[in-house]
Each structure stands twice: as structure tokens, then as C-alpha cells.
Amino acid sequence: MTLAQEMTLLGQKAKEAARLLAKASPAAKNAALTRLAALLEEREAELRTANAQDLDAARARGLDAPRMDRLTLHPAVLADMRAACLHVAGLPDPVGAMDSQWQRPNGLLVGRMRVPLGVIAMIYEARPNVTIDAAILCLKAGNAVILRGGSEALHSNTALAALLRQALEEAGLPADAAQLVTTTDHAAVTELCKLDQYIDVMIPRGGEGLVRAVTEAATMPVLKHYKGVCHAFVDADADLDKALDIVFNGKVQRPGVCNALECLLVHKDCAAAFLPRVGRRLGEAGVEFRACPASLPLLGPTAKAQSPDDLGQEFHALVLAVRVVDDMDEALAHIARYGSNHTEIICTNNHEHAMRFLREADASMVAVNASTRFNDGGQLGLGAEIGISTSKLHAYGPMGVQELTTTKFVVFGQGQVRQ
């Protein structure tokens, strides 16, 4: 069987599974999710063994520390996966829900009903937990999913996909509602991108190169999880103690993730008071600063002169670009030029400035006096997320269960005919 035939077969199986899953009862879907949570606990030793194989191979290839962290199924990550299964099982089922209803003058009752998208192809890189996060959301929303993870996580993803299929079968649902692409041939993604007769939506989640390649090749709609160039603007009248905690959390907690802070913008009126504190606290945590001329002498020994390439950069590391700005106009102009529509935050005690920033900063999440790290489906109350969309059509921001459905019009009549 050729690669094209293999991918076509996956698509055909997924399309049929999606048809069956769309009419599955909420109880059956929730039973599969609950069983999956139990299997993740019962088979944890097997999962850790599979993950160790991936980690050993990654070390041998010299994978960097942030990517090793994303690849690792830490105990906390496994616990979060189990919790996500149970949380999503407890969410209201969106399928069949009526978003709105109204009556026309001729007596027709018109409504909008939530329905699954159909078949979703998820293309992602080093994080094996995405296998579970993506599948459980697709399942809850009545969608079949084709999963194509990175080659570095193949053993982990294969073990997780086996549990997914077991949970589906035990709940009386089609196992083909969750299929994993097991070939590491990059051409598999190209072949999937051609299958618009079977795949309804493509979701790439990973590096900029992956997202661009899928977007350019896909013959079906793409929900882009693009890069996270996240900014924090510390306004002149910010609470500097809170701002320091927010900046530290955004950069240091998990520097390799998409909602990590990448660029700090500081109002010139508080730069002298704030930046030395940033330099000490973040510098002690190992952060290297890429500093503009005004901030360079204020940040201490871990600061280096900024190059043009440092702006708009997703570092995936303990590196932070820093720039002093004259006012909010300059901060917003910087974000408009270098941001990636992911996450932007302001630290300020000025309500007018806060509201202006919320209106004008163009991102899927904009926050006041809170860390960039909160742009996450779980943190925003959506349960697990399939990704953070930086596209504005269909979904913008973390994509939970609701975002994996669409609406169709339903009409109730009593024999009306159009005049």
C-alpha cells in the first residue's frame, strides 16, 4: 500500500466513524472519557516506559532542554491528563444544543443547533499530552480525529492512542474515531492535506515552519495554532511588586511553552525603578536579556545588546527581549508590528489605560494585571484545549469543546410554503 493509499484509508475510516460518533449519546461519550482516565492510571507504568524510549532517543540526538521538557510525561502531566478526561466528561455536551431560536412572521420557528465539525486532523510536535487533550475534546464534540504527532514522541503517542481506542471500544463507540498516523515520513502530512473529501478541518500545533507548511498545503480549512510572541507592557503607574511577579511567572515558570512571555515593554517613567529589580530576580533564575539601549545599563550582567532579530522572536528558552517605550501608543505600535495575535498583557492601575489596551491590543487573549500563562483552556475554564487559535475565523483563542462544533439552521413549520 502506498503512503497516499494509507492516508486515504485513514480518512475513509475517520469519515465513517464521525458519522457514527455524531449520533452517539452523551452517556456513551462520557463513559469513554471516564474509562480513558482509569486506563491512564492503570497503565501508567507502560506509558512511562514508552516515554522513556522517546526521551533516550531524544537525548542521543541532542534535543535541547525546553523540547525535552515538552516531550516528558512528568507525573504531574499524567495527572493533568487524567483530570482533563474527567473534567471534559463533566462538561455539558454541546451536540444538539440550541444556541438561539426565533419565530418568523409566517410562523416558522428558526433555530441554530450545535453539530460536530466532522473529521479533524491534528498535526502537532513534541508534546505527547496533546494526543489526549485533542482526542478527548474531539470525542466530546462528536468529531473523529486523525492524530499526527512528532516523530520524537512516536512511542509515547502510540501507547496513548492504544488506550484511546480501547476506551472507545469498551464504551461501544467506533475505535476509528481516534486514529494515529504511525509513519514518521513527513510526506504523510502532505497527503493528509489533500484529503478534503474526508477531513473537514486541519489543526497544526507546533513551530512556525509546521504551521506555515500545513496552511499552504491544506485543501480544507485550517485553524492555526501559530507562534506565541507574547508581550507584557508595564505602565507608568503599575504596581511594580505585582508586575515583577507577573513578569517572572510569564518568563520563568515554563519558558518553552507558547504562552510564555517573550518581550517586556516598560514605560520610561518607571524603567529606572523597575528594570534593576527585573534584572536581579530574573537574572538569578538564569534569564538572559536582549536589551534595547535604554534598558541595557539597568538590567545587570545577564543583559546583552538587542539585535533586530530579537524582536518578534519566540525564544522557547530563558531569554527575554526588553524595550523601554515612551507611552502606550509606542507599546501598542510595537505589539501591532511584532506580536503574533496570541497573548498580550498590561500591568497598570489606570482603568482608562487598561480598557484602551483591552480594546486595541490584537490578540486571542488580552489581560490586565495577570500573567500571559493564563491563556490556556484549562485556566480559562474550558477544560483541555486542542490548541490556541491565532486565526480569527471560526475560533480565536483556546479551542475547547464548544469551538470544535459549528451550527446548522433548523426550521419547524406547519405546512408553510414560500410565496
Label each residue range with its predicted role.
Residues 126-127, 133-144, 159, 163, ...:
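ALDH superfamily catalytic-core signature
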Residues 1-109:
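N-terminal Rossmann-like NAD(P)+-binding subdomain of aldehyde/semialdehyde dehydrogenases
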Residues 117, 307-419:
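Conserved C-terminal structural/oligomerization subdomain of aldehyde/semialdehyde dehydrogenase
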Residues 90, 98-241:
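Rossmann-like NAD(P) dinucleotide-binding subdomain of oxidoreductase/dehydrogenase enzymes
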Residues 22-23, 236, 324, 347:
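A structural signal for short, well-ordered beta-strand elements
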